[in-house]
UniProtKB/Swiss-Prot annotation:
Keywords attached to this entry: Cytoplasm, Methyltransferase, RNA-binding, rRNA processing, S-adenosyl-L-methionine, Transferase
Top enzyme class: transferase
InterPro entries with a match to the protein in the record: 23SrRNA_methyltr_KL, DNA_methylase_N6_adenine_CS, RlmKL-like_Mtase, RlmL_1st, SAM-dep_methyl-trfase, SAM-dependent_MTases_sf, THUMP_dom
Record keyword Methyltransferase present: yes
EC number: 2.1.1.173, 2.1.1.264
Pfam families recorded: Methyltrans_SAM (PF10672), RlmL_1st (PF22020), THUMP (PF02926), UPF0020 (PF01170)
Lineage of source species: Bacteria, Pseudomonadati, Pseudomonadota, Gammaproteobacteria, Methylococcales
Coiled coil: none
Protein's name according to its UniProt entry: Ribosomal RNA large subunit methyltransferase K/L
Domain THUMP: 46-157
């Protein structure tokens, strides 16, 4: 019986879940997704198949030994434990890759040299000669990774990164790596579309990487079949007969696959790109199978059966100014809407705002990395109900228009200086105190001002992402206050924000906060769909300053989310009235066994999914359910579902038309809490929060549970001026197993 070995497949960040599925299909066993790759077990044939057929992996490492290496001497001794003469001879060329994390040996060149010395000294002792070093295409490549002073030493079977298929010797500007291109196509559902006979079109094909990878997928061609070099060809354990058998099998599959290849077409305006594309297509053996020609993207038209339009357009970071690209995206979007209805589309871009110029609402989003550059893959169904009118240039929202008018008034002297200066002084004071606190504690999103001065009833929130954004909420004045005076005070306050915070007006967003009624919490304020990414607690979230009443991230629950992360490990987590799922991200990050996110709004549930995806959490263990939470609770109780951790943050009041009746948290808390507690496992925890002021907890509904008021504990420093912003309890179910 063939010997089973341990292997590790490295992969670009974000591709690990796809690689797990691919390895499973290639016969790997004991598959485990880890940081920067996937562990698996298999025979030598399994490893050869992965080297030949993996479309996603970078390198395949065969584990040789593991040992403690807290010092250079321990590393040297550990490397010498392996009998290197069993793997290669002294006449072979050698390269060593060394990496280190959380270890005493931090210098990678020093670590690599120590490994080389240990191997060379062993050969000198046994053979009287040593292998020579060759950095490019060595006969043998050794990989050593040190993590927490534990070394893993392996043989790099790939030799060179597997994304280098061999068909591309030149590329145009901003090239796309071949395994990333394959991931884009797999995420876009191209294998299924191709199986149905659908066409593949790339309107900005560049050097044809997406087109060629699409053909390899559709025709069942092994991506490693073009390569002449692998890291096992000079290895003493290499089974040449087995390798030749696998190559023959791959050739037979390719011949059969090419006979059913659907139409694949590419276009580009750049003559040089078309020449490169044709050369690459020739080297891939696909001449006559892929059609490319010079044409502007806006003039591309469908050919063949409806299929997939895939594109990796320029996005500013690589080929120029973002503003100049808006017409490119917009014209391309208009082409899709007019001529490609019924098709699917996939767009990979490093600029989220440019993607909205397409004018089609994406059904799904995935975060991928083009090298170190974070990108988003947007997947579209091209149908009229998904179309919207994108904004022109850098459009001005109603809030920004109001802000501009206020600032212009201040410049003309139409706003009394004393009004402005009073607010500005308080803002500067808060910036000194809270700004310093935020920097020291790694808090990038916080409330800077919260109606500190009664005359200026606004909240000013700071959001740090790729830029610094300021979100200003004007609290609606009571009926007893003269509207003219209220507006004058608002103007005096807001006019100073750009100057004091040194933030461009375009990065400041102004809203009026009113009481929510019925479906109000789900209704958009505008139609811009304008999102940004911010960070909190090491996690990343999409926020929207313009289209909804709230931004998608409740800042007052920062500590509450951290508490959830602390206690989530190995628990099944339920998030009720989940909003954008930020608590779910924290639970997943804390090691929850699974998460279930329930909300009535499709918009917010989709937002939650994008937040999970942004942080690398796939759909396998993270269920999202669109439902009236009260109705869903009834069903969950009947089905006797159980969770180890539940977060309950219901609305204060709701009479939405999508609900069977009105809901008042003070009035209806008893039945609600009883049902939620009944879903807890023995010893399980419920974190219950409400924003209702003067809320009184009915502890009779929690009989038998341990109840702890954590309102003060979960109140962040930046909300201490408003201690009743929320009330929060930690509720423990009785441990019936005692």
């Amino acid at each position: 019986m063939p010997m089973t070995r341990d292997f590790f497949a490295t992969a670009p960040k974000g591709l690990e879940p796809l690689l797990v599925r691919e390895l499973d299909g290639l016969g790997a066993e004991s598959i485990k997704e880890t940081r920067a790759g996937v562990e698996f077990r298999g025979t030598l044939e399994t490893a050869y198949r992965v080297c030949l057929w993996s479309r996603l992996a970078n390198r395949i490492l065969m584990s040789l030994d593991r040992f403690a290496a807290a010092t250079p001497e321990a590393l040297y001794d550990g490397v010498q434990r392996t009998d290197w003469g069993r793997h290669f001879g002294p006449g072979a060329t050698l390269a060593v890759d060394f990496s280190s994390r959380r270890s005493a040996i931090t210098h990678t060149l020093f670590g690599a040299q120590k490994v080389k010395d240990a191997i060379a000294d062993q050969f000198l002792e046994h053979c009287g000669r040593r292998p020579s070093v060759r950095l490019e295409r060595p006969d043998i490549r050794i990989n050593v990774h040190l993590d927490a002073d534990q070394a893993v030493i392996g043989l790099d079977l790939s030799g060179d990164s597997l994304h280098r298929r061999g068909y591309r010797t030149e590329a145009g500007p901003a090239p796309l790596k071949e395994n990333l291109a394959a991931a884009v196509l797999i995420r876009a559902g191209w294998p299924d579309i191709a199986a149905r006979g659908g066409s593949l079109i790339d309107p900005m094909c560049g050097s044809a990487t997406l087109l060629i990878e699409g053909a390899l997928l559709a025709a069942d061609i092994a991506p490693g079949s073009f390569r002449e070099y692998f890291g096992f060809l000079a290895w003493k354990g290499h089974d040449l007969e087995l390798w030749r058998k696998l190559l023959t099998e791959a050739r037979e599959r390719a011949e059969a696959g090419l006979a059913r290849l659907p139409p694949i077409l590419g276009y580009d305006l750049d003559r040089r790109a078309i020449h490169l594309a044709l050369d690459n297509i020739d080297r891939a053996g696909l001449r006559g199978r892929i059609h490319v020609e010079r044409k502007v993207a806006a003039d591309v038209r469908p050919k063949g059966r409806p299929g997939l339009v895939v594109v990796n357009p320029p996005y500013g970071e690589r080929l120029g100014d973002v503003e100049s690209l808006i017409p490119v995206y917009r014209e391309f979007g208009e082409t899709l809407q007019r001529h490609f209805r019924g098709w699917n589309a996939a767009l990979l871009t490093g600029n989220f705002e440019l993607a909205f110029q397409i004018g089609i609402r994406a059904g799904r989003y995935h975060t991928l990395y083009n090298g170190a550059l974070e990108c988003r893959l947007f997947l579209f169904d091209i149908a009229p109900e998904r179309f919207f009118t994108p904004r022109s240039g850098v459009p001005e929202t109603e809030g920004q228009k109001k802000l501009r008018q206020i600032v212009e008034k201040a410049r003309r002297g139409a706003i009394p200086a004393e009004q402005s200066e009073m607010f500005a002084n308080r803002l500067r004071k808060n910036l000194r105190n809270l700004g310093t606190w935020a920097r020291r504690n790694g808090v990038s999103c916080y409330r800077l001002y919260d109606a500190d001065l009664p005359e200026f009833a606004v909240a000013v929130d700071i959001y740090q992402g790729e830029k610094l954004w300021v979100h200003v909420q004007e609290y609606e004045a009571p009926a007893s206050v003269d509207p003219a005076k209220a507006q004058s005070r608002l103007a005096g306050a807001v006019a100073m924000i750009p100057e004091v915070l040194e933030v461009p007006r375009e990065q400041i967003f102004l809203k009026v906060r009113r009481r929510q009624k019925g479906d109000a919490q789900y209704v958009k304020q505008g139609q811009t769909a304008h999102f940004h990414v911010v960070e909190e607690g090491g996690w990343r979230f999409w926020v929207n300053f313009e289209d909804y009443l709230d931004t998608g991230l409740f800042l007052d629950h920062r500590i509450t989310r951290g508490l959830i992360q602390q206690v989530a490990r190995d628990r099944h987590f339920l998030n009720l009235f989940a909003y954008t799922g930020t608590a779910t991200v924290y639970a997943a990050g804390g090691g929850a066994a699974s998460t279930t996110t329930v909300d009535m709004s499709h918009t917010y549930l989709d937002w939650a999914g994008r937040n999970l995806a942004l942080n690398g959490f796939g759909e396998r263990d993270h269920l999202r359910i669109q439902a009236d939470c009260l109705d869903w609770l009834e069903q969950a109780v009947d089905r006797r579902r159980r969770y180890g951790l539940i977060f309950l943050d219901p609305p204060t009041f709701s009479n939405s038309k999508r609900m069977t009746g009105s809901f008042d948290i003070q009035r209806d808390q008893g039945p609600l809490l009883k049902k939620v507690v009944s879903l807890l496992e023995p010893g399980g925890m419920l974190i219950f929060s409400t924003n209702r002021r003067r809320f009184r907890l009915d502890e009779t509904a929690l009989a038998g549970c341990a109840v702890e008021d954590v309102s003060r504990v979960t109140l962040p420093k930046d909300f201490e001026r408003n201690p009743r912003i929320h009330a929060c309890w930690r509720i423990l179910a009785p441990d019936r197993q005692r």
